[in-house]
């Protein structure tokens, strides 16, 4: 015979088991990241449910009417099993979101990584094209500004001519003895080229070549008694 209060304990255990199954089903339906293995509560939920079903069936066998709690637990277990089968069929052949290896309890189905990678590559290509166009526009604008600045600047001053190194002047030889010899040679040539007519021939020519004596027109005093000239 059933002890009083035991149905309440069984109902509480069934509620806990149904809550665990509901959480498991919600996690399987959740597309978010999952752990590679089942948790501690998820692993113990099927055992608890099996023990609870065994207890309820044993009590129902002693009664003529199947309790409603047993039907509720069986329905919850069937729903959890169906959800697990659907989740397993959906995740069959999927790959790991981290390593890319196929596994049974994958986060993403097969092909999701390829699609994501293709979309990422397309987005990167579009960003590169947009950045390239903007960079070219900036370069053209900078060239125009530089040309305008060059036009405003004054012309550069002419570069100074290259400095020439002075040439080395050869040392002059002493010109004293050479000049003396040259002067002596010139004097000898001048003396030899003088004509013989320039030399005086005799005393007559000496008188002729002499300069005439200037007459003194000053009146000289005449002594008394001397005849005065002036007549023939």
UniProtKB/Swiss-Prot annotation:
Compositionally biased region (Basic and acidic residues): 19-31
Spans annotated as Disordered: 1-47, 153-178, 191-232
Top-level taxon of the source organism: Eukaryota
Regions of compositional bias (Basic residues) in chain numbering: 211-220
Protein family per UniProt: Belongs to the FAM246 family.
Protein name: Protein FAM246A
């Amino acid at each position: 015979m059933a002890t009083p209060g035991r149905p309440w304990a069984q109902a509480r255990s069934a509620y806990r088991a149904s809550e665990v199954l509901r959480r498991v089903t919600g996690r399987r339906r959740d597309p978010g990241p999952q752990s590679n293995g089942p948790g501690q509560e998820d692993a113990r939920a099927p055992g608890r449910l099996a023990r609870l079903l065994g207890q309820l069936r044993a009590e129902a066998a002693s009664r003529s009417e199947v309790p409603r709690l047993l039907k509720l637990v069986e329905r919850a277990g069937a729903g959890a099993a169906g959800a697990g089968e659907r989740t397993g069929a959906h995740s069959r052949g999927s790959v790991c979101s981290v390593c890319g290896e196929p596994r049974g309890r994958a986060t993403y189905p097969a092909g999701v990584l390829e699609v994501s990678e293709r979309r990422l590559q397309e987005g990167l290509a579009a960003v590169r094209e947009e950045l390239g166009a903007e960079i070219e526009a900036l370069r053209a604008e900078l060239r125009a500004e530089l040309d305008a600045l060059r036009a405003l600047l004054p012309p550069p001053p002419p570069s100074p001519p290259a400095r020439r190194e002075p040439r080395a002047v050869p040392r002059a030889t002493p010109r004293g003895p050479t000049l003396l010899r040259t002067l002596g040679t010139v004097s000898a040539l001048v003396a030899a080229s003088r004509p013989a007519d320039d030399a005086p021939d005799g005393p007559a020519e000496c008188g002729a070549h002499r300069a005439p004596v200037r007459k003194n027109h000053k009146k000289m005093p005449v002594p008394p008694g001397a005849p005065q000239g002036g007549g023939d």
